[in-house]
Amino acid sequence: MFAKAFRVKSNTAIKGSDRRKLRADVTTAFPTLGTDQVSELVPGKEELNIVKLYAHKGDAVTVYVSGGNPILFELEKNLYPTVYTLWSYPDLLPTFTTWPLVLEKLVGGADLMLPGLVMPPAGLPQVQKGDLCAISLVGNRAPVAIGVAAMSTAEMLTSGLKGRGFSVLHTYQDHLWRSGNKSSPPSIAPLALDSADLSEEKGSVQMDSTLQGDMRHMTLEGEEENGEVHQAREDKSLSEAPEDTSTRGLNQDSTDSKTLQEQMDELLQQCFLHALKCRVKKADLPLLTSTFLGSHMFSCCPEGRQLDIKKSSYKKLSKFLQQMQQEQIIQVKELSKGVESIVAVDWKHPRITSFVIPEPSPTSQTIQEGSREQPYHPPDIKPLYCVPASMTLLFQESGHKKGSFLEGSEVRTIVINYAKKNDLVDADNKNLVRLDPILCDCILEKNEQHTVMKLPWDSLLTRCLEKLQPAYQVTLPGQEPIVKKGRICPIDITLAQRASNKKVTVVRNLEAYGLDPYSVAAILQQRCQASTTVNPAPGAKDSLQVQIQGNQVHHLGWLLLEEYQLPRKHIQGLEKALKPGKKK
């Protein structure tokens, strides 16, 4: 379901009543969880968000996010745990085991075929058709996928372990997993006999090189089953088989690498130094600490990683900046009550001068179907002029008719050629043009018809352009040009009051510039650390607006001007940004 990128509709903090309902739903859906475990999974006071999204096939899914990780998702009123949750509660669902080579196929969207199952010494778990199950890999009990059983255990055995076993909904490494902290499965020892007993166990499980080759051809449902998995029949046991590289790869991060907190501390330091060295200038000071985080540090986060201060040892931005101030890299002051700003930076500090800027990579700005996301490039916007009926006589000699679209330079050339061809240039003063009946009808007002006989070149051209209808052409990268009458509407940024006197930022007309409102909302939600929603724009057909909690005009302006490189003339409302020292 999440093999391809999804589209976020909204991301909001959960209400108290919804939190209580979610707890009740979790208790009903997963009766094996105790009261303490339910409270741990759905905390009472910690931040919990509801993300509504559309999967790539159009399914409406509700995802519950806690601590930056998706913990549960709801589809057609059924509640499912994510792999992040299953790693904390590995026995929550009946678990079936498969080979590490199969994982790549599952991540790509394949269902799990029964030949891919590994038969444990104790036999397969007992399930009925439609039961929710977990899927783990040989050597590690941490689930890497969840799916719905396509048949009961008895039917699986009767079929000789052939056919489709599980409809896979979610996997480790899919796009739902990527929306979290992207941690690897923990190493959880299998509930099995020790290696000595396994070697004596009749029918012990193993996989030879031929079988590994077959597994690489495992197919989707409906295709020929080239990748059937059988238990090997040689004398060697699993304990004697060489360690599978796929299994090693899955567990290596959690055992050998640094802890997630240490990794986040390093990422925080990297983004901090990168922002000071490349983005912040002396003229930007004093700089709100919230702006420094949202507009500068987040922009320096490497592609594929997510900066989350709550997962660092500092927990809060203010605590981290205090540490940087103690190291005399920056100076932070409270210029107004409750609002801190960076007022000074020591750009000669050894940590800044010695910092090596990471290899730049284009920031993925659009969320598209498929695993490859494309960077945003601003469109080429060109003003045009449309020939109205009243100007047809002037332009028909050059082959143009009513409704023709022309550039300003083309209009100039046509008017000059018309004047020269009809010998209208004044003989005594080359800067003047005599007006013939066609020019009089096209560019003069009625009260000027008998009084104005000549016009300077610049006045003639200006009047001509004013009489033409405005139009424009938008060319998005890789697409055919789009030509429309009228003037292109600017991206409109406004502030509005909502319930409880809360202020929100609303932005409209993003689509005209090739921007996906859902993508922009997702980026702003991360940058501003505020809830965002996408709704139909009032009074505009087939147009959406993005709403962000609080005054986020500064963050929005930085995104549009600095990162998307859109011209300022196409954006209105930037003056509504918070001034340094003012409260939100």
From Swiss-Prot:
InterPro entries referenced in this protein's UniProt entry, alphabetically: EIF2D (IPR039757), eIF2D_N (IPR048247), eIF2D_SUI1 (IPR039759), Pre-PUA (IPR041366), PUA (IPR002478), PUA-like_sf (IPR015947), PUA_eIF2d-like (IPR048248), SUI1 (IPR001950)
Positions of modified residues (Phosphoserine): S237, S254, S361
PROSITE patterns xrefs: PUA, SUI1, SWIB_MDM2
Annotated ranges, domain PUA: 93-173
One of the Pfam families matching this protein, by short name: Pre-PUA
Polar residues composition-biased segments: 247-257
Region (Disordered) location: 223-257
Keyword Repeat part of the UniProt annotation: no
Recorded GO CC terms: cytoplasm; cytosol; nuclear body
Example GO BP: ribosome disassembly
Keywords, ordered alphabetically: Acetylation, Cytoplasm, Initiation factor, Phosphoprotein, Protein biosynthesis
Residue span(s) of domain SWIB/MDM2: 383-467
SMART domains: PUA
Any one GO molecular function term: signaling receptor activity
Localization terms from the record: Cytoplasm
Residue ranges, compositional bias (Basic and acidic residues): 227-238
Top-rank taxon, per record: Eukaryota
Gene3D superfamilies, per the entry: 3.10.400.20, SUI1-like domain
Modified residues (N-acetylmethionine): M1
Family stated for the protein in its record: Belongs to the eIF2D family.
Function per UniProt: Translation initiation factor that is able to deliver tRNA to the P-site of the eukaryotic ribosome in a GTP-independent manner. The binding of Met-tRNA(I) occurs after the AUG codon finds its position in the P-site of 40S ribosomes, the situation that takes place during initiation complex formation on some specific RNAs. Its activity in tRNA binding with 40S subunits does not require the presence of the aminoacyl moiety. Possesses the unique ability to deliver non-Met (elongator) tRNAs into the P-site of the 40S subunit.
Protein name: Eukaryotic translation initiation factor 2D
Organism the protein comes from: Homo sapiens (Human)
Gene name per UniProt: EIF2D
